[in-house]
Amino acid sequence: MKAVNLVSLFEESVQKHADRPVLIADNQRITYKQLQTAVSAVYQSLKKLGVQKGDKVAIMLPNIPEFVYYCFATFQSGAVAVLLNTSSTSYELTYLLNNSDAKILVTHPSGEKRYQEIKDKLETCYTVLAVNPGQNHVAAEPAGSPGPLSAAIDPDDPAIMIYTAGLTGKPLGAVLTHANLCSELDMVHATFRRTPDDVGLCLIPLFHSFGVTVNMLNVIQAGCSTVMMDRLTMDGLFSTLEREKITYIVAVPRLYMGMVFYEKAAKYDLSSLKLCVTGGSAMPADFIPVFEQKFSVRILEGYGLTEASPACSFNRMETVAKPGSIGTALEGIDIKIVDEDGREVPRNTIGELIVRGGNVMKGYYKDEAATASVLKDGWLYTGDLGRMDEENYIFLTGIKKRMIITSGFNVYPREVETILNMHPAVQDALVTGKEDLLRGELVKAQIVLRDGFHPDEKDIIRHCKVYLSPYKVPREVEFVSAITQVP
């Protein structure tokens, strides 16, 4: 029986796998039953704070067990988990909390400091919960204490909201329902075929759509376990792979490149590793066979976007991958390549990818115009350009919208340009992507200065760091007499 919402999915998995480990972090092994106890405790805490169905609970945490506790407790409350990047600056956080109508912010101590800086500017978020990793949420419940009584959850109720870069310079909140995510999970599960014996490595941030779907929700669905890593070194990565007998990794291309170039790799036993999955940015086609030969494991590349929960297409274990391809549509998803008028183009003709399926978002929060611009007649217009061959393999060729993809994160130039133009010395600015082997692209800024001002590159970057998350900050600044490239 397929789960109809994330709460029933969680409860069914706890019943089936109660004594199996689910979360492994800092040598702590948390079973499904202990996870349920922790979620129950957090649920009761949220209930005492007045969290009700439909409320927004903002979660800004790294990859620690408490992220999972608060997510599922929020689902059980019938509330919406608003997942926020832990590197969000005070400037960004003010907008995100106000735009989302968040009632509570759950964060780490450094996030609490940012909250205190902006609390007088907040319109709805009057409560902050500072989480210290390792808090004792998994202690046994007192005898006779009632378990959580979940709110009535409809499949079409919103479950998660994740902000994605907006064309206007302000992020848009993509609203994903319980039905969207359950549909996505069924497709992902059919593709990767995880079993309770699998042990994954949780590297992609859980606040990222791919991280929360594949490294949290699909783990619960499959009854397997995941090793949570918040900080990464190659020594730590390989030690963990060997010690925990990791069977699969989900990560951005940069990690796999680092693994290939790691000079001590041969001394570790990685024989347990069965599958590596990647996406978020393009993997150089000639790099994949190098990785597969060195580690004797398949690496599957795919494609997705936050608005689609996110995975849409993937290469498969049972098929031979075509170099440069993001695979074929997941079962249950329709993908077409269309022209400017929305008409399907012939095979091997470049056009825009559009997607249809139960995984496609409900819409952008409080932005009907932006929603209408991407959701048309049941199809999600992705803004990505590509072609499809006679065997339904998809190849990305470019981006219709102005966007930079760096280490799997989307950056819209307009947002960075807005911040650059706030600097008193800047008359005009243009932000573009510069090709980079490890990150895919780097953020580059061209700047025209006002007369009488002479800032250097460090001044401009320092200004950007005040307002922008680190991945959005330009890595290179070029001072020019005029902007030559038109957006």
Where are these regions (language model features)?
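AMP-binding/adenylate-forming catalytic core of the ANL superfamily
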Residues: S88, L105, I249, G357, ...
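Structural core segment of the AMP-binding/adenylate-forming
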Residues: K48-L49, F72, Q76-A140, P148, ...
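Conserved AMP-binding/adenylate-forming core of the ANL superfamily
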Residues: K2, L6, D19-I64, V68-F72, ...
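Conserved pre-ATP/AMP-binding loop-to-beta segment of ANL
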Residues: A3, D19, G144-Y163, K170, ...
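Conserved AMP-binding A3 loop
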Residues: T31-K33, A159-S183
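Conserved ATP/PPi-binding loop(s) of AMP-dependent carboxylate-activating enzymes
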Residues: T328-G332, R343-V374, V411
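Gly/Ser/Thr-rich phosphate-binding loop
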Residues: I246-A251, V260-A321, D334
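Conserved AMP-binding/adenylation subdomain of ANL enzymes
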Residues: C182-V199, F207-Y248, G258, Y262-K264
